[in-house]
Structures are given as C-alpha cells and as structure tokens.
Amino acid sequence: HAKLIVSLDCGIRSVEMVQLAQSFGIDFIICDHHRPGEELPPAVAILDPKQKNCPYPYKELSGCGVGFKLLQALCMRAGYSSDVLFEEIDLLAISICSDIVPITGENRVFTYYGIQKLNQAPRPGIQAIIDVSGLKKAIDVNSIVFTIGPRINAAGRIDHAFAAVDLLLASNKLDAANFAGTINDHNLVRREFDETITGEALTMIQNSVHVDTACSTVLYKNDWHKGVIGIVASRCIEHYHRPTIILTKSNGKVAGSARSVPDYDLYEAIDKCSDLLIQFGGHKYAAGLTMEEKNIDAFRIKFEEVVSASIRKEQLIPMISIDLDLPLNQISTQFYNIVRQMGPFGPQNMQPIFVSRNVYDDGTARILKDKHLKLNIRQEDSVTYSAIGWQMHSFFDRIHKKEPFDICYTLEENEFNGKKSIQLLIRDIQFVKDRNPQI
C-alpha cells in the first residue's frame, strides 16, 4: 500500500524502476550523490548535487548526507526543531567516512561533530561494536573506516542489511550486544572471503601474460562472493597500481565492482565501454556495473584500450606526497596537538606526511605476527620514538643490521597501560644506501 519510496545513495540512474513504480501509483524521491546518466528518472523530486544545473553549492555530500539535507529541509518547512535531527549526526559521520567522500566543506563539519558524539555518548549499537571489536582508543576517521564501518557493511555483504538496522536501532545494551555479535561473525566470514578471493585474484594477475604491461585489471570468476569484490579490487590496487574491476556471476548476469587510482576518472573510462554493459553507475573513483557473460572478453579488451589511451604513466606508480622534512627532535606533544587540529582527516584533507632522514633503530626492532614491523627509532640528536609499519616485515633484516634509513610517516597517539605517547605510523622506508642521488 506504499504511496512513496525514498531512495538513499542510489536511484539516480534507475529510470525503468521509477517508471515501474509510477505505473503502480507510487511516487519516488531520489537522494543520491552518484553521477546521473543522460536521462533522469521521472521522480517527483531528485536530490543529487551532481546533476546538471543543481544550484546546491557543495557537491561532495555522501548519499546519507543528501538524505540528511532532505530531513533538514523537512524540519524547516514543518517548523520542527533541527535538534532532533542532529541527534543522528553520529550516523551521518559514519556514512561520510565509510563512503570515502572528501572530508572537506560540510562533510568535514558533520564528521567533526559526529565523531564528538561517537566518543562522548555512543548509542548502544555503536558501543556494542566498539566492545566486540576491541577498539580501545578514541574514535576517529580511521576507526570508522577500518573498524566500525566494515562491521556495519558486513551484514549486507554476507547476509542482509536488516541486521545492521537492528543494531543501530537497538535501545538497550543486551539487544545491541546480541546484534553486534552476529554482525561481528558476519565480518569474520567477510574477512575469510576477502583473503581467499584476493589471493586468487593476485595469482590470476601474476599469471597473466600482460602482468608487466597492462594499464588496467579486469578479472572474472563465477563463484566469487559479490559482497567482497569491491574490497578485493582495492586490495589488488595495493599490489598492482592500476584501475581494477572484479567481476562475478550474479542472478544470471555478471556483476562487477570497480576501483581507481588517484586522479584517474574511472567513471569516464567505463562510460566509454557502456555499449558492452547492461548498466553501470558510480563516481570518479568507484563504480558498479552489470553485463552479459558473453561480453567479458570484449569489455576487458576495450577497457584496457580506453585506460591505456587516457592514463598518465605517473598515475600507474604509487606515490607518497611528503608535506614536511621533519627532524625527530621537533616532534612534541604540542606539535602533535597542532597537527591534530587540522582534522578530521580523510580524502582531500589527508593527514600530513612527514619524512625524517638518516634514522636508525635502537636495537629493539622486532616483527609482530610475522608481518608487521615494530621499531624504536632515533637520530643522533633526538630522543627515541616508537614506530610501527603494517605489512613491512621485509625491511627487518637491514634495519636489524643498523643500516641508516629515511622514513616517511604520519603521527598518531598510542595508549598502553593508561599511558599516552606519540607513535610514528610508517608509510614507507628507504635505506640511505638506496637513495636516488638526483633527488
């Protein structure tokens, strides 16, 4: 008996679906932030800052951010206080961080106040996720992106998103803990799928005859789990830095998830291959697509042609942009607090990356869990700083032999046994012997 459907984070290209709803006398309001196609759906209202001639000044709202704006306008029109709406700003912050949209403008303001609420008065469902995940430190953008967001998303990836809705709506600790336990189990399954499929995908790339020359990656396996192929695409880019599309069988068709490298417009590239697709949608750095199985090879060839003709060579090389050459003796609590004021950090407002040169370990270097690097580093005239590098165990032998090296890193606050200290989060290491003399 529904008379109105409101879409959130989708619908901008769903022309036929909205037409079908119309035929049943159902109105549609679309809240989306993806790029529209040439034809807009015949909805009674379309809220999308990326549609042509949209006067709204800020174009980078998340999908939930657009929905938040609809509710904000509704409060204004109906004379309701917006205080009730802003009670949900913690959920808006989670959406902004999880959607990987720029942390600029309104997004930065919403994220700042949303994170404040997450830390000061988390709702039962969020507190339950914090508890079940073992998260100890204050919540920030990274906590949302890597701990809270993936668990909420895991419900829909592995089973059904209703489980996440139940969690976020839970009004007491007991219900929240039960829902969080279920969602955490889904996340463990998601991780297993992620690791297995990523391993298979990387092996396929390694065995490809074009592994060293290709400008793109398009992989297909009919039994890959659709819920993790976007994550797998991102993992592949970490190893092979080029636009990547992972495809799998879904409902008799082939569905895909695409991810890009910095500054390359993936959406435009896919659009040029749209004659081989049933449908697609997304934005510059991420997209989804559907095609017939018979078109996979033709799509792979055409997509590679499009990318190789439009991507710059430097975009295929992972780069780390250094913000400041920083001697270790200039790092202090005061300096860290000044840096922290620039947050919340995220896309287009990334945490400053520093480089300190000619450093060495104090002899306590060790490997954690067979893959992570834990150091205590110093320069000749500095105190010693704790540093950690995820997945950087390959540097251990040379560091252990006291070879001096340059290190680029971000700063973070580490808490152990109730004591807070500044820790260096390593982004990359270059040994002094390996320096390029031209740099």
PLM feature spans:
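Conserved acidic residues
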Residues: 3, 44, 406
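Short, ordered loop/turn segments at secondary-structure junctions
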Residues: 10-11, 33-36, 45, 50-52, ...
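Acidic-glycine-rich active-site phosphate/pyrophosphate-binding loop
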Residues: 38-48, 377-383
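Mid-to-C-terminal polyanion-binding domains and interfaces
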Residues: 175-179, 185-219, 272-439
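Hydrophobic helix-and-loop "lid/oligomerization" segment in the mid-to-C-terminal part
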Residues: 1-4, 9, 24-25, 75-298, ...
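Intrinsically disordered, low-complexity regulatory tails of plant transcription factors
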Residues: 14-15, 99
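Short alpha-helices
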Residues: 41-80, 85-97
